[in-house]
Amino acid sequence: MFANFRNCFKIKNSRLIYDNINKCLLTKEETNQLLKFIHLKWKPAKDQVQISFSRSSGPGGQNVNKLNTKVIVNLPFKQLESCIPMFLINHFKTCEMLRNYRIQNGIKIYSQKTRSQHKNIEDALNKISDLLNKSAETLYVPDTPPEKIARISILKKESNEKRLSEKKYKQKKKTQRRITMD
């Protein structure tokens, strides 16, 4: 039931801030949808994004100076509602991993890796896909294997026994210090 607690707490300005525990609790259906999303490695279609072009910077000579090869891809969250579960969209809106790419109502990615517009469009769409998949993976915490649970219980038991033996040792030491007056 408790899928992930690390997203519930954020360290900010040296203090722990509680951040709505309901965001971290995923139902079985949501967990299945999440795993399906991660497994499929979802990639936005060109009709789901808004693409614009501008002049690229850096080396490239006349190609850089005259052609608009830099690609700016905006992915509005409204476009995601038809193909991605709502709890994931809400996660994308608040996820720390996407904070540098988030704009008011979507995600904005730049690409000027190559000298071709088409390759830069593909690169930008791949960047969006990778970012959203990595962000979704932070929500999933697999079940603890039984071997690890058994090991943890053994360690707890040993720790408790050690604590009790130290306590008995201190008690015995104090009783030996007492002087009995007969």
Curated annotation (Swiss-Prot):
Belongs to the prokaryotic/mitochondrial release factor family. Keywords: Meiosis, Mitochondrion. The keyword Transmembrane helix does not apply. InterPro entries: Mito_Release_Factor_mL62, Pep_chain_release_fac_I, Pep_chain_release_fac_I_sf. It comes from Schizosaccharomyces pombe (strain 972 / ATCC 24843) (Fission yeast). Residues 169-182 have a biased composition (Basic residues). One of its GO terms (biological process) is mitochondrial translational termination. It holds the Pfam family RF-1. The keyword Mitochondrion applies. This is Meiotically up-regulated gene 82 protein. Has a role in meiosis. One of its GO terms (molecular function) is translation release factor activity, codon nonspecific. Residues 161-182 are annotated as: Disordered. It comes from the Eukaryota. It is found in: Mitochondrion. GO terms for cellular component: mitochondrial inner membrane; mitochondrial large ribosomal subunit; mitochondrion.
